């Protein structure tokens, strides 16, 4: 009987078995003892978790249920299991042992855990409604009575427009401005929608007035007319170098009928020595950026502005946004102080200032107060545009051309890169469907990254190239020339969305490129007659008239509604059709659709919505129903291929990280009125990193330094060449004392650190390089 009682005592449940653990906890602080007791109690209440040991130990040493286990003074911590793939808890530790010190990478799925759009059903029904094609609002006038000769232009100039420039009729804004500027000498404010011909609207009256002065002088004094040394009569100011170049090209085309009138440019990025030589020879019309003109007015004695009678401020709102208010005020003050009565007959007694802007914002009104006096507001006649009366509220509004077809796509942040690729694949699938397209992104680093992604070569292509490198070298050079490959690295074949029947050339443009590279790239894109794409920042969003642009893609939304309207204004110009697509993310960004609708006179009835899944199906799956099954696999395979490409090369990986960080900084610079729709706190940084081909956690994405501006690079170069103060150089060019080299290096390092610190306080605004 006693033995039976002992057996019953040993068969008592586990609570009595683990009781001795309470008495065995000794040593340490009271916090350690308390935590050890809690762990022991937790293990007692959850006996199943005791089986988390390896399978090998369980099979070799079966546990004895009658054995009493006594824990040590400190209980052993349980291993944290982070197993997303279901392959066991030992896999993460094995990966860490294989790659010691490397940041942990995570390969997530493209089509899992993506947020859904908020208003999917309502917008889909609205997009399904049929809308009639709108009548173009910025096309040349059809009425035969509205010719250039009837507006007051001379017969030679009108004939030159018709025969050489193939401009048959004026637009509505050209009709209103030419009539006003030729009739009166008062200041004027020209306001018109994008793509309506504002450049010709103020250039034609200027050229006509100077031609009239020259003709009158020739009649009075035989054999003499206006020459390049007669004086500077007109100055045109533009915010960007590209716009100045374009204005100069248009002006040069107009002056072919009056070769005695000479025009020139002074812009940033060019050699001041060459500009001073042109100014010494003499110019009649000068196109300039505000900063460079202010510099020449201060330092160049050959620049005589005493005869300037016309001053044009093109894109006035952009001039103020880029911070040229101080320079403009100084230029106007110097022009007023240096103005003198002219000896040439026919020149007006006072200066006429013309301000051109698409909007009447507060900054434009402030610029008008600085430069204009009793100005006349010139707008296109509503009857000339669409025959409908304009409401009072719409007088000052900046509208989109009616023939422009705007659409938007709600795309999750993880799917942005593959969706853009699929859309471009579908766009250039057939030859001749789209000739030219522009992709707008937020910052220069993002331009460089996407350019490398879209022009990279696949593995199969690289193998074929290595095999036939020697035999087909000449053929490859011919193909590069056909596609316009550039020695500057800004033009390359777009392998991501090209096909054998329709090759596409990709161009990149941003403000960090040298000026001659920017000019060459923009000229190559404009002259290219083959399908081509330009990926750029807002440096190409204002005033540029690029021919045959059929499509504008806003991959990153603009920083303001006005910038958005200027971006999409690169297409649908002078009555031509055009399309525009903007990428928005699910959530708060969907509220931006209401702003898109405000840009249309009809309230955005023609605004359509594209589904991200439909874009991916058409780009990676095709039209056949059987092919639509594996479009997700093809999209995933393409994304993983890009990620592997970035991981294999440190330069590409650093480029992706720079683009990711610059994109986040640019995202935080939206104007205050739209910041609720572009809230940086709502961004899923991990999903966003996926769209930049990154597998690292957002907290582990670090970049050694920011992009250096051009000015900083020049300063560093000059500082390296300067000798140390107080030391003489030998004949060979070396310093007498070798100890000066570390001292100079320390000075340069301190200067670089100071510049980096200043850039951090400036919130990274310098890397956008818009001007």
UniProtKB/Swiss-Prot annotation:
<dbReference type="InterPro" id="IPR027417">
    <property type="entry name" value="P-loop_NTPase"/>
</dbReference>
<dbReference type="GO" id="GO:0016887">
    <property type="term" value="F:ATP hydrolysis activity"/>
</dbReference>
<dbReference type="Pfam" id="PF00270">
    <property type="entry name" value="DEAD"/>
</dbReference>
<feature type="domain" description="Helicase ATP-binding">
    <location>
        <begin position="179"/>
        <end position="378"/>
    </location>
</feature>
<keyword id="KW-0698">rRNA processing</keyword>
<comment type="similarity">
    <text>Belongs to the DEAD box helicase family. DDX31/DBP7 subfamily.</text>
</comment>
<feature type="region of interest" description="Disordered">
    <location>
        <begin position="23"/>
        <end position="139"/>
    </location>
</feature>
<keyword id="KW-0539">Nucleus</keyword>
<protein>
    <recommendedName>
        <fullName>ATP-dependent RNA helicase dbp7</fullName>
        <ecNumber>3.6.4.13</ecNumber>
    </recommendedName>
</protein>
<keyword id="KW-0378">Hydrolase</keyword>
<dbReference type="GO" id="GO:0005730">
    <property type="term" value="C:nucleolus"/>
</dbReference>
<dbReference type="InterPro" id="IPR014001">
    <property type="entry name" value="Helicase_ATP-bd"/>
</dbReference>
<feature type="binding site">
    <location>
        <begin position="192"/>
        <end position="199"/>
    </location>
    <ligand>
        <name>ATP</name>
    </ligand>
</feature>
<dbReference type="GO" id="GO:0003723">
    <property type="term" value="F:RNA binding"/>
</dbReference>
<feature type="region of interest" description="Disordered">
    <location>
        <begin position="458"/>
        <end position="485"/>
    </location>
</feature>
<dbReference type="Pfam" id="PF00271">
    <property type="entry name" value="Helicase_C"/>
</dbReference>
<feature type="compositionally biased region" description="Basic and acidic residues">
    <location>
        <begin position="23"/>
        <end position="35"/>
    </location>
</feature>
<feature type="region of interest" description="Disordered">
    <location>
        <begin position="703"/>
        <end position="771"/>
    </location>
</feature>
<keyword id="KW-0694">RNA-binding</keyword>
<dbReference type="InterPro" id="IPR001650">
    <property type="entry name" value="Helicase_C-like"/>
</dbReference>
<feature type="compositionally biased region" description="Acidic residues">
    <location>
        <begin position="460"/>
        <end position="476"/>
    </location>
</feature>
<keyword id="KW-0690">Ribosome biogenesis</keyword>
<dbReference type="Pfam" id="PF13959">
    <property type="entry name" value="CTE_SPB4"/>
</dbReference>
<feature type="compositionally biased region" description="Basic and acidic residues">
    <location>
        <begin position="119"/>
        <end position="135"/>
    </location>
</feature>
<feature type="compositionally biased region" description="Polar residues">
    <location>
        <begin position="53"/>
        <end position="69"/>
    </location>
</feature>
<feature type="domain" description="Helicase C-terminal">
    <location>
        <begin position="403"/>
        <end position="615"/>
    </location>
</feature>
<keyword id="KW-0347">Helicase</keyword>
<comment type="function">
    <text>ATP-binding RNA helicase involved in the biogenesis of 60S ribosomal subunits and is required for the normal formation of 25S and 5.8S rRNAs.</text>
</comment>
<feature type="short sequence motif" description="Q motif">
    <location>
        <begin position="146"/>
        <end position="175"/>
    </location>
</feature>
<dbReference type="GO" id="GO:0005524">
    <property type="term" value="F:ATP binding"/>
</dbReference>
<keyword id="KW-0547">Nucleotide-binding</keyword>
<feature type="compositionally biased region" description="Low complexity">
    <location>
        <begin position="90"/>
        <end position="105"/>
    </location>
</feature>
<feature type="short sequence motif" description="DEAD box">
    <location>
        <begin position="314"/>
        <end position="317"/>
    </location>
</feature>
<dbReference type="GO" id="GO:0003724">
    <property type="term" value="F:RNA helicase activity"/>
</dbReference>
<dbReference type="GO" id="GO:0000464">
    <property type="term" value="P:endonucleolytic cleavage in ITS1 upstream of 5.8S rRNA from tricistronic rRNA transcript (SSU-rRNA, 5.8S rRNA, LSU-rRNA)"/>
</dbReference>
<dbReference type="InterPro" id="IPR025313">
    <property type="entry name" value="SPB4-like_CTE"/>
</dbReference>
<dbReference type="InterPro" id="IPR011545">
    <property type="entry name" value="DEAD/DEAH_box_helicase_dom"/>
</dbReference>
<keyword id="KW-0067">ATP-binding</keyword>
<feature type="compositionally biased region" description="Basic and acidic residues">
    <location>
        <begin position="712"/>
        <end position="723"/>
    </location>
</feature>
